[in-house]
Amino acid sequence: LENNSALQQIIPYVWIINPREKKVFVYKRASGKQNYNETRLMNKVSCGIGGHIDREDSANPIENAMIRELMEEIKMENYPKPKIIGYLNDDSDSVGKVHFGIVAIAETFEDVKKGDKEMAEGKFYNVEEFEKILNDSKNEIESWTRLSWPFIRDYLT
């Protein structure tokens, strides 16, 4: 299924935001096949925490997958319930052709730390700081992050 564009897999994609400080959690994906399951996204800058829906998520698959992915990929004291804000269908690259995104936000006032080996580093940035990252040609930005950013920015400002 992972490479069959006729059957897109649904992927929760959760932005972690601090609405009071108007900041977003930004991270760089790990490099090296030993650290990362999805090699097509290695070393890219991303704001979406997410992944495939698993059988264990079956009772409420989308919400359960969002929470499970947050707990796997980041560390924080309390995991907020994400709110779905939209959908993403991006056929511009090999990853997007086989996935359909459910974009959500998780609001927190807590500190967030990287959780697993798939994330090289991560921290909160304000809108202006993140837009500098987006516009810096040295950074390879994940397409879903770039496509959903205008909606997140509007939400924060």
Predicted regions and their residues:
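A short coil-to-beta-strand element that immediately follows conserved catalytic motifs
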Residues: 77-86
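Short, well-ordered strand-loop elements centered on a beta-strand within folded domains, enriched
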Residues: 21-29, 111-118
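Conserved active-site beta-strand-loop modules that form the wall/rim of enzyme catalytic pockets
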Residues: 22-25, 81, 101-102
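Acidic, metal-coordinating catalytic segment for phosphate/diphosphate chemistry
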Residues: 1-22, 29-34
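Nudix hydrolase/Nudix homology domain
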Residues: 41-54, 86-157
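Conserved Nudix-box catalytic region and its N-terminal flanking loop in Nudix hydrolases
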Residues: 23-72
